[in-house]
């Protein structure tokens, strides 16, 4: 039930291992840190990592008359989370489903979860372009989806897959809100200097060629990795980091696109 959700943002990646779920999670936390009410929906059925990233493993969801009730991270109920990970008894249990069953589960997540007055719903999708993505796009035709953010790394093999993702978005009619280049450079935990140990600026160049906004370049920062397993936002814990600055910029970009006022500045 998305009738109480003002804005829907889909987070995509051309391939796995680019940090899409981490970006989705920190974006949701950054939006909450700036005063928004946020929902985070993890539809990566075969590799749900959002419960782990937020330290919510072992949480139980239940159903009410209006549908599934998401997990709230605290009593303020400003961040609601739903993932198939909450339905698995063991984190190591594989989800061995054929396409139709996956499609049915995703439709349930998009239509039967009781989201309450959310400014934003962030949807963390599986990597690639598959049945799951087509299902999401079909369901998004029934609700106001603002568009998609694509996460990539600067390596050529990842960028090749992102080109396919861009084509997929165009063919399915979803607006591209921008590209985030992740894992670009390494931040020394001692001096905080960033060194480009791999290639860099591939995401920025791809955004230029695709004529979509380049939302920022995120480095590998061990300090950000330490926040995994908690609901701590980089905006609060590492306010001077480059990751925090990029997340602020993305929040401001989304607020400008959606005309949602920012209740608080962090």
Curated annotation (Swiss-Prot):
Keywords linked to the UniProt accession: 4Fe-4S, ATP-binding, Cytoplasm, Iron, Iron-sulfur, Metal-binding, Nucleotide-binding
Subcellular location: Cytoplasm
Cofactor: binding details: Binds 4 [4Fe-4S] clusters per heterotetramer. Contains two stable clusters in the N-termini of Nubp1 and two labile, bridging clusters between subunits of the Nubp1-Nubp2 heterotetramer.
GO terms for biological process, alphabetical: iron-sulfur cluster assembly
Taxonomy, superkingdom: Eukaryota
Molecular function per GO: 4 iron, 4 sulfur cluster binding; ATP binding; ATP-dependent FeS chaperone activity; metal ion binding
A Pfam family annotated for this UniProt entry: ParA
Any one cellular-component term (Gene Ontology): cytosol
Cofactor: [4Fe-4S] cluster
Chain residues that bind [4Fe-4S] cluster: 188, 191
Annotated S-S bridges: none
Amino-acid positions noted as binding ATP in the UniProt annotation, renumbered to this chain: 14-21
Family designation: Belongs to the Mrp/NBP35 ATP-binding proteins family. Nubp2/CFD1 subfamily.
Described purpose of this protein according to its UniProt entry: Component of the cytosolic iron-sulfur (Fe/S) protein assembly (CIA) machinery. Required for maturation of extramitochondrial Fe-S proteins. The Nubp1-Nubp2 heterotetramer forms a Fe-S scaffold complex, mediating the de novo assembly of an Fe-S cluster and its transfer to target apoproteins.
Subunit structure of this chain's protein: Heterotetramer of 2 Nubp1 and 2 Nubp2 chains.
HAMAP family from the UniProt entry: Mrp_NBP35, NUBP2
Protein name as catalogued: Cytosolic Fe-S cluster assembly factor Nubp2 homolog
Upper classification of the organism: Eukaryota, Metazoa, Ecdysozoa, Arthropoda, Hexapoda
